[in-house]
């Protein structure tokens, strides 16, 4: 009986551990997204290049009502998953989509170039459907 209980607890803890991982990193901009009150001119959606640009030039972003939503290491599928929360819900006029570098580097495993292009195309279609101009 103890053995069954031990295995049950072991598998339950593994399942709970897997559920706590935030693959798309929704938490990263959760509080910042809630604090945006004015419609941004542009949201920059991307990976480390975008992430570091915002950190190195904060005045440029603030002075122009630009918002940075880059996350280092992210691939196009992760960006697509968080696109609603980090772009659409902010209602920008324009979204600049900077991605594909980490897909090519296989940061999240193998992905075909066709799938990368489809992810980018999907983000563009979602943006257009919400009245946002996509720039790739």
Feature locations, PLM:
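Sec-dependent N-terminal signal peptides
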Residues: 4-13
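Short, glycine/serine-rich, charged loops/turns that create anion-binding
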Residues: 11, 49, 102-103
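Hydrophobic alpha-helical membrane-insertion segments
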Residues: 11-12, 56, 109
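Serine-esterase "nucleophile elbow" of acetyl-processing enzymes
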Residues: 17-96
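Alpha-helical cap/lid subdomain in secreted, periplasmic
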Residues: 59-65, 80-136
